[in-house]
Amino acid sequence: MNKPVHNNEHRRKRFNKKCPFVSAGWKTIDYKDVETLKKFITERGKVLPRRITGVSSRFQGVLSQAIKRARHLGLLPFVGED
């Protein structure tokens, strides 16, 4: 009998992403560190999801609060720059 052929194109490769903040030993994220915050937002100014950045759930909440504070104080734009 013929064995079923598996289509490997549809399989996803799983990567173990480590949280960049945990691996660097960060305790908190500073809202004034704009260069770090810019790495976690899109060109349009949206916060990147955890599945893309690999940030832990604890730091994702802290990160989004820091981005919101920086936006409110005018350090980051609400909408991406053209």
Swiss-Prot record:
Output the Pfam families linked to this UniProt entry.
Answer: Ribosomal_S18
Q: Does the record carry Plastid as a key word?
A: no
GO terms for CC? cytosolic small ribosomal subunit
- PROSITE patterns xrefs: RIBOSOMAL_S18
The answer, when asked if rRNA-binding is one of the entry's keywords, is yes
Question: InterPro entries given for it?
Answer: Ribosomal_bS18, Ribosomal_bS18_CS, Ribosomal_bS18_sf
GO biological process annotation, one example: translation
Under Gene3D superfamilies, the record lists: Ribosomal protein S18
Which keywords does the record carry? Answer: Ribonucleoprotein, Ribosomal protein, RNA-binding, rRNA-binding
Can you provide one Gene Ontology molecular function annotated for this UniProt record? small ribosomal subunit rRNA binding
Q: Which domain of life is it from?
A: Bacteria
Reported function? Binds as a heterodimer with protein bS6 to the central domain of the 16S rRNA, where it helps stabilize the platform of the 30S subunit.
Q: Which NCBIfam families match?
A: S18
The record's subunit annotation is:
Part of the 30S ribosomal subunit. Forms a tight heterodimer with protein bS6.
Q: Which PANTHER family match?
A: 30S RIBOSOMAL PROTEIN S18 (PTHR13479), SMALL RIBOSOMAL SUBUNIT PROTEIN BS18M (PTHR13479:SF40)
What's this protein's family per the entry?
Answer: Belongs to the bacterial ribosomal protein bS18 family.
What protein am I looking at?
Small ribosomal subunit protein bS18
The scientific name of the source species is Chlamydia pneumoniae (Chlamydophila pneumoniae)
